[in-house]
Amino acid sequence: MARYIGPKLKLSRREGTDLGLKSGVKPYDVKTKKSARPPGQHGVSRNKSSEYSLQLREKQKVKRIYGVLERQFANYYKEAARKRGATGENLLAMLESRLDNVVYRMGFGSTRAEARQLVSHRTVMVKKAGRDEFVRVNIPSIQLQDGDVIAIQEKSREQLRIKNAIELATQRGIPEWLDVDHSKLQGTFKKAPDRIDLPAEINESLIVELYSK
């Protein structure tokens, strides 16, 4: 399955919620005021959604939020199921611990897609906990561990898009499981988030039910 490159707002309309795919400069409800219905020729279906369709839709929504493709998402689920604790919560914690997501959460990218691009272009450096030196990386899916430090490389620090992203992040707020110093353009991954720290609009139990069949 190829990565979707079409209109981002269309995906949010399809899921009926803001997936965080746009920068957030203009509120989601304003952007969709004239197009509140799901995209497509026929708009809203009158048929009641089946249990399976609800489960599948929730999986699609989470995949789109984090920009993860089908096979990769399935691998995340398998790993989450092997860990101790609630599988659904483990899954979300792993997705939130991805490098591209953390770059976004820290405010260095206005969207996860932009954060992913920053990583792919080797703009981001990571210093593993207990190490002394930063290493430039280009793999967005790197799983961060407690104490890992992220920084923007020196020559990229004046990029306008990074400055704009930081301004948006100050309005959005930084999660408590991260420690960020925007003046130094770096931050620390303190720990993986707990469920209370994660998006409330996600119903991970539907995804667990889907994969448990």
UniProtKB/Swiss-Prot annotation:
Pfam families to which the protein is assigned, alphabetical: Ribosomal_S4, S4
Gene Ontology CC annotations of this record: small ribosomal subunit
GO molecular function, one term: rRNA binding
Family matches, as SUPFAM superfamilies: Alpha-L RNA-binding motif
Annotated family: Belongs to the universal ribosomal protein uS4 family.
Keywords noted in UniProt: Ribonucleoprotein, Ribosomal protein, RNA-binding, rRNA-binding
Organism: Psychrobacter arcticus (strain DSM 17307 / VKM B-2377 / 273-4)
S4 RNA-binding domain span: 97-163
SMART domains assigned to the protein according to its UniProt record, in alphabetical order: Ribosomal_S4 (SM01390), S4 (SM00363)
Subunit structure: Part of the 30S ribosomal subunit. Contacts protein S5. The interaction surface between S4 and S5 is involved in control of translational fidelity.
Protein name: Small ribosomal subunit protein uS4
Taxonomic lineage from the root: Bacteria, Pseudomonadati, Pseudomonadota, Gammaproteobacteria, Moraxellales
Region of interest: Disordered: 16-53
Source organism, top-level taxon: Bacteria
Compositionally biased spans, kind Polar residues: 44-53
HAMAP family: Ribosomal_uS4_B
Its biological purpose: One of the primary rRNA binding proteins, it binds directly to 16S rRNA where it nucleates assembly of the body of the 30S subunit. With S5 and S12 plays an important role in translational accuracy.
GO BP annotation list: ribosomal small subunit biogenesis; translation
